[in-house]
Design a protein with these regions (language model features):
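Feature recognizes metal-dependent phosphohydrolase scaffolds
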Residues: 1-623
Length: 623
């Protein structure tokens, strides 16, 4: 009987704790997209809480610290290691101890302030375990209590005297970063042209506790390559060579490109239309030539295998992409829609006019070597399953719908229907179907041509693919033709219709979301589109992309906290050193999307619903 009573007490205590959590303010969610492998740019957003850290510092120290000192504190929180080194050089040695005292005290205040909305165990997870006892005293106890002022002062002084102050400051800054954002939503394209997508995955897996991915079409290339899609792999290699990023494959994923490099440099010569896009000055002519020739080799192999896939899958409706069989016999012209166009700097020497989509024996040898490496790369498998396990084609979260790309529709807003194996797919169930195919392909990787591989590649560039959202990917035209009209890629009508509230309501209904909800969309949209559309029901976030040219805007991120939603207009990111030198904040401007008259609590969230169900189950045990 005594044990039963003890269990009842434990159940009641759990109910009390869970009920208390429901009354806490809703945590802050950050929505970003199009990371594109740029780790420094990604970290600049994450460390700043997408602008939330500077807002908290302003709220806390307005009237107590000058704007300059607020900036210094914010910059320290973003980049503690670098700023500490710089501060040591700038601070007079006689004033160093006071600087440390002031800095630590301010950071303790910030940690307290940003942790107010969290239960104790969440804050504990964000704090460095090496300083658990110290932070427990400094952060959770009454720092202003008269009887303990000397005690707290002595504790901080000992941190300084024992040369522990630097590492303590760094740990507190990292805690602020984690507590400023409760959940990160990355709405597509962790991977693309950038050199460090592996570091982004590493940061999330080791340093963050609450996040999700909504896959983008560039992510599909990497996931598909791991699943054995040769077409995904060739596109991936071509893009990596185009942006001088082949070293990533070897350094991060232990993929040896020797066979491809030897083949490409023996068969092709550098051409101006395949000149790699390189920003660094420390690139040799040999490296440039390798990038150039590998691009050519991968492009031609890609076109050949694309032709085979398009012929295998008439349901893709991509016959307009069959262009190798439209080349003239001398391969200097191509016929498109009945018109002949001059080829600029062609590299079609391996294309057999009689069988233009046939892979040569030498090409086949290279492809087999590489695809076997991709499917067997331990680190690539680890990272791609991390993306798969923590991601999806779309996410319904806290009455918001998140996805990258589009939900394919016609000009009238009717969902485009796909008929596969006698069944029609459209809208929500089309995205569900593609997610099933992708994960099934990853669970059963094969390097042979198969249904899953073809459909995974289609997600990358297929006509009106939900993750691509255009009528074609004009790779051939952009490489070989000067006609700008032919190079144009038309967006699915989805993007124009996003300006209409009725269309937003239709999308929300299709995914069974309340009409008061929002759609948060990632991807490079139609240029100059307003980021807030459809009476504030659709929000475009593209905060890390380089798509906004000739502008002093670096994109957009979205924050959703207990007070509502606000869109952050971001500064262009040049590099980490520039941010530290200028002490520049990540945010240029803010725009309210939604403001709550009553502050939202955990009870209003999906997590709150989960807690309520847990409380109900516990309460039933007391009956």
């Amino acid at each position: 009987m005594e044990n039963e009573f003890t269990n009842f007490d434990e159940i009641k205590t759990k109910i009390v704790n869970l009920s208390a959590v429901l009354s806490l303010p809703k945590g802050t969610e950050a929505f970003i997209s199009d990371v594109h492998g740029n780790n420094d740019k990604y970290l600049n957003i994450i460390r700043s809480g997408a602008g939330n850290v500077s807002r908290k510092v302003e709220e806390l120290f307005n009237g107590r610290l000058t704007l300059v000192n607020q900036k210094k504190l914010v910059c320290l929180i973003y980049y503690p290691e670098e700023v500490l080194q710089k501060s040591k050089q700038d601070v007079d040695p006689d004033e160093a101890e006071q600087w440390y005292m002031d800095t630590i005290n301010r950071l303790i205040e910030v940690v307290r302030y940003v942790s107010n909305k969290y239960p104790r165990h969440i804050v504990d997870q964000a704090l460095d375990s090496r300083f658990h006892d110290i932070t427990k005293e400094l952060v959770f106890e009454d720092f202003a209590a008269a009887d303990k002022i000397a005690y707290y002062r002595e504790m901080i002084k000992n941190l300084i005297d024992l040369n522990m102050s630097d590492i303590f400051i760094i740990s507190m800054c990292h805690a602020v970063q984690k507590l400023a954002i409760e959940r990160i939503h990355i709405i597509g394209d962790v991977y693309d042209r950038g050199s460090d997508p592996n570091l982004i995955i590493k940061h999330l897996s080791e340093s963050w506790q609450n996040f999700d991915f909504e896959w983008g079409n560039h992510d599909i290339l990497w996931m598909g390559s791991m699943a054995g899609s040769k077409l995904c792999m060739l596109n991936l290699i071509r893009i990596s060579a185009r942006y001088h990023n082949l070293a990533l494959l070897k350094n991060a994923y232990d993929i040896d490109l020797t066979s491809m490099i030897k083949f490409a440099t023996n068969r092709y010569v550098p051409l101006p239309n395949f000149e790699p896009k390189i920003t660094s000055a420390n690139v040799t002519d040999q490296e440039r030539n390798i990038d150039n020739c590998v691009q050519q080799a991968a492009t031609i192999m890609q076109f050949k295998l694309e032709g085979q896939a398009i012929k295998r899958r008439p349901e893709f409706d991509m016959d307009d992409r069959l262009l190798l069989d439209k080349l003239s016999l001398d391969k200097k012209k191509v016929t498109i829609n009945g018109h002949d166009y001059q080829i600029e700097n062609g590299c079609f020497q391996s294309v057999n006019p009689a069988k233009p989509y046939q892979i040569t024996h030498s090409e086949q040898t290279v492809i087999i070597d590489l695809i076997n490496q991709f499917t067997h790369s331990t680190k690539l498998n680890e990272h791609m399953w991390f993306m798969a396990d923590n991601g999806s084609m779309y996410l319904k979260h806290n009455d918001n719908l998140l996805f990258h790309g589009c939900v394919p529709v016609d000009n009238d807003g009717n969902f485009l229907k796909w008929k596969i194996d006698g069944r029609e797919y459209y809208g929500k169930n089309l995205l569900d179907y593609f997610e099933y195919i992708l994960k099934d392909g990853m669970h059963h990787p094969t390097t042979g041509d198969c249904f899953n591989s073809d459909f995974i590649w289609f997600l990358w560039e297929g006509k009106n693919s939900p993750l691509f959202g255009k009528n074609k990917m004009a790779t051939f035209e952009r490489y070989f033709l000067k006609d700008e009209k032919l190079q144009q890629e038309e967006f699915n009508p989805f993007y124009k219709l996003c300006h209409n509230e009725w269309f937003a309501d239709k999308l929300l209904k299709e995914f069974d979301i309340n009409s008061r909800g929002h759609i948060v969309n990632g991807h490079t949209s139609i240029s100059k589109d307003a980021p807030i559309m459809a009476n504030k029901k659709i929000v475009l976030v593209n905060g890390l992309s380089d798509s906004i040219k000739d502008s002093d805007i670096g994109g957009y991120a979205l924050l959703f906290d207990s007070y509502g939603m606000r869109l952050e207009t971001l500064r262009p990111f040049i590099n980490r050193q520039k941010v530290i030198e200028d002490m520049s904040d990540v945010v240029l401007d803010k725009q309210i999307v939604e403001h709550s008259s009553e502050r939202k609590t955990v009870a209003d969230t999906d997590y709150g619903q989960k807690i309520k169900r847990q409380i109900a189950k516990l309460s039933a045990q007391l009956e």
